[in-house]
Structures are given as structure tokens and as C-alpha cells.
């Protein structure tokens, strides 16, 4: 072992090994597919409590609602959502 070495394998040696690619050839695509299904199924919206893209605006609106009264904002939004 060289002076100052931590005893770990060099990164280049790891990524050029067959064992690394056998493991990661399955793991990396599986993570990608799982993430794609998590988002495309809508489960991500339910898990994090965010509104779905089609529920941001009412049917008749073409832009984001603007709250005019600062201290009555909840009442203003409640009347808009009725």
C-alpha cells in the first residue's frame, strides 16, 4: 500500500470491473423505471400532497388567481372555489 492510502479500491478500478456492471445493469434501469411509474401513475402527487396539474385552475380560468385583499385572502379564495 502506498503512503497516504486509505486502503479503498480506486474508483477507476471499480467502474471497470465486470461485477460492478452486472449489479448496476439491473439496478440503474430498475430505479429509473420505478421513478417513472411513481410519477406517471400519480402516486407522487398523493404521497407529497401536491395538486395535480389539471387542478391548479378552475375550468373557466386562463391564468392564476390573484388575491386582492391581503387580510381577507382566505375568504376570497373560498368564494372563488365555490
UniProtKB/Swiss-Prot annotation:
Its main location: membrane. GO terms for molecular function: electron transfer activity; heme binding; iron ion binding. SUPFAM superfamilies: Cytochrome b559 subunits. It is a single-pass membrane protein. Heme binds at residue 24. GO terms for biological process: photosynthetic electron transport chain. With its partner (PsbF) binds heme. PSII binds additional chlorophylls, carotenoids and specific lipids. The chain crosses the membrane at residues 22-36. It is found in: Cellular thylakoid membrane. InterPro entries: PSII_cyt_b559_asu, PSII_cyt_b559_asu_sf, PSII_cyt_b559_N, PSII_cytb559_asu_lum. Keywords: Electron transport, Heme, Iron, Membrane, Metal-binding, Photosynthesis, Photosystem II, Thylakoid, Transmembrane, Transmembrane helix, Transport. It comes from the Bacteria. Its cofactor is heme b. NCBIfam families: cyt_b559_alpha. HAMAP family: PSII_PsbE. Heterodimer of an alpha subunit and a beta subunit. PSII is composed of 1 copy each of membrane proteins PsbA, PsbB, PsbC, PsbD, PsbE, PsbF, PsbH, PsbI, PsbJ, PsbK, PsbL, PsbM, PsbT, PsbX, PsbY, Psb30/Ycf12, peripheral proteins PsbO, CyanoQ (PsbQ), PsbU, PsbV and a large number of cofactors. It forms dimeric complexes. This b-type cytochrome is tightly associated with the reaction center of photosystem II (PSII). PSII is a light-driven water:plastoquinone oxidoreductase that uses light energy to abstract electrons from H(2)O, generating O(2) and a proton gradient subsequently used for ATP formation. It consists of a core antenna complex that captures photons, and an electron transfer chain that converts photonic excitation into a charge separation. This is Cytochrome b559 subunit alpha. It comes from Prochlorococcus marinus (strain NATL2A).
Amino acid at each position: 500500500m502506498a503512503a497516504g492510502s486509505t486502503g479503498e479500491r480506486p474508483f477507476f478500478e471499480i467502474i471497470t470491473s465486470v461485477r460492478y456492471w452486472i449489479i448496476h445493469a439491473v439496478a440503474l434501469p430498475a430505479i429509473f423505471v420505478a421513478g417513472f411509474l411513481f410519477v406517471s401513475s400519480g402516486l407522487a402527487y398523493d404521497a407529497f400532497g401536491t395538486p395535480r396539474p389539471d387542478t391548479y385552475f378552475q375550468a373557466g380560468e386562463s391564468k392564476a388567481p390573484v388575491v386582492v385583499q391581503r387580510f381577507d385572502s382566505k375568504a376570497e379564495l373560498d368564494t372563488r372555489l365555490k
